[in-house]
């Protein structure tokens, strides 16, 4: 089959890789939630060969991911998992979770579900990295983000750029502590949380 292509993956993969190198250096098993085309997975798995990179997606997107994984044939990219966040989740636990450009596509109920289920798939000291655009103090960080949010809502009113404070509140309830909020190109962010770390320790 013709492999799906997301040009944004080529634009953002190097900056994201920098964050992953910093925070996933001592990690071993990554669950990527919403792997999309699979292009991020093969790039990060090739660059970070110490990681076992587990992709996941809704059923209709799995063939495209398999096509990329089959072509690259990396030893650290197992068969993608079917994951609808409102349905059944994996039974395995991971010491790292990664998700890019998903929270603004999901409905808010789905975002809540993700954070509610994260403790079930995370080890005691697991880390979560979420990449994408976020609002702060209820405000867009750029005119381009405001335009992007309007475009998202034309596609579906359940979509939209999320408020950082609301997402972080879900993370806190799930037992996660924000340890970095890194600015990324094109008005995006990488939010990094760790489980089992107090906010005081994270800011020390």
For each predicted feature, which ranges?
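Core SAM-dependent methyltransferase catalytic element
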Residues: 176-204
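A short acidic, Gly/Pro-enriched loop at the edge of an enzyme's catalytic core
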Residues: 89-97
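A short, conserved alpha-helix within the catalytic core of class I
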Residues: 106-118
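Class I SAM-dependent methyltransferase Rossmann-like catalytic core
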Residues: 1-26
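Conserved beta-strand signature within the Rossmann-like core of class I S-adenosyl-L-methionine
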Residues: 125-137
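Conserved class I S-adenosyl-L-methionine
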Residues: 26-36
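Conserved Class I S-adenosyl-L-methionine
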Residues: 141-165
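Class I SAM-dependent methyltransferase SAM/SAH-binding core
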Residues: 31, 39-87
């Amino acid at each position: 089959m013709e492999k799906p292509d997301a040009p944004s993956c080529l634009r953002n993969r190097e900056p994201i890789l920098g964050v992953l190198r910093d925070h996933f250096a001592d990690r071993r098993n990554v669950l990527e939630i919403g792997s999309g085309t699979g292009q991020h997975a093969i790039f990060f798995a090739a660059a970070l060969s110490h990681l076992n990179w587990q992709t996941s997606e809704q059923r209709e997107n799995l063939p495209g991911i398999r096509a990329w994984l089959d072509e690259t044939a990396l030893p650290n990219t197992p068969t993608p998992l079917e994951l609808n966040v409102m349905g059944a989740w994996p039974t395995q636990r991971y010491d790292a979770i990664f998700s890019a450009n998903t929270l603004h596509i999901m409905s808010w109920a789905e975002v809540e579900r993700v954070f509610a289920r994260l403790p079930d798939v995370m080890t005691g000291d697991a880390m979560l990295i979420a990449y994408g655009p976020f609002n702060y103090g209820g405000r867009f960080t750029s005119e381009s983000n405001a335009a992007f949010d309007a475009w998202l809502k034309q596609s579906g009113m359940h979509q939209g750029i999320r408020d950082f404070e609301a997402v972080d509140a879900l993370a806190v309830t799930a037992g996660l502590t924000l340890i970095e909020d890194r600015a990324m190109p094109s008005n995006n962010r990488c939010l990094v949380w760790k489980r089992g770390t107090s906010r005081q320790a994270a800011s020390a």
